[in-house]
């Protein structure tokens, strides 16, 4: 009896120990699953930390390269983006998770594209700057060259020696103008047009030509706004006419044909007349028919006689 009781106690103890061991230590398959999950989480964390660190490094590098040289920034950013994508793919393959590698590739490619686009848009290449500067310099330098050429072509304008005097009364004559304007210098010519119907009356204006332009300037200064016969007059300078170029413009009018003579105008009238007999031809046929009848009637009458 004692042995059976001892055996029962020992069996009960073994069962309790098995229960404790089952509660304390999980199965080896569960341990493996948990270890795999932990390793995946660690690899994901490592991949994200590496991506963030690589992005920060890439941004710092691009900023430094932009300040150093704008032309080499685009090429270097491309190389950094390719290296970052290669490192991200290596981390993804080591971890064995396809989702993390795809996300790292897309992130690195987007960052590299944004950095390259910002660098290209923000700072233009030095070649473009030089080209723009050349264009601006050329556009600025062209107008003064044209002005210089025009100045060389243009001769200095001669000073006027002729003065136009307006708003004269009809009582003023050439002698009066000669007396007044001879005080300012030697007068070369006085032109005072007269009305056709009343030759003793002037049209109200005159031209006075001096020998020197300085004398004409004196007359303009003193007599513009002065009074003659109780009325204010106007004195203005008359510019000398420019020498005209040789008459090349007269060639087109010479090419114009003169009006045709009378004998050339007659043929179209003859043509018009030629159309009219065709219209009158049936009328003539009708007119001939009664004559024939008359002849026949006469012949018949003669035969009867």
From Swiss-Prot:
This is RNA-binding protein with serine-rich domain 1. It comes from the Eukaryota. Residues 159-244 are annotated as: Interaction with SAP18 and ACIN1. Gene3D superfamilies: 3.30.70.330. It comes from Rattus norvegicus (Rat). The RRM domain is required for the formation of the ASAP complex. Residues 161-240 form the RRM domain. It holds the Pfam family RRM_1. Residues 1-10, 127-143, 151-167, 266-298 have a biased composition (Basic residues). The gene is Rnps1. Phosphorylated on one or more of the four Ser/Thr residues (Ser-43, Thr-49, Ser-52 or Ser-53). Ser-53 phosphorylation site is important for splicing and translation stimulation activity in vitro.
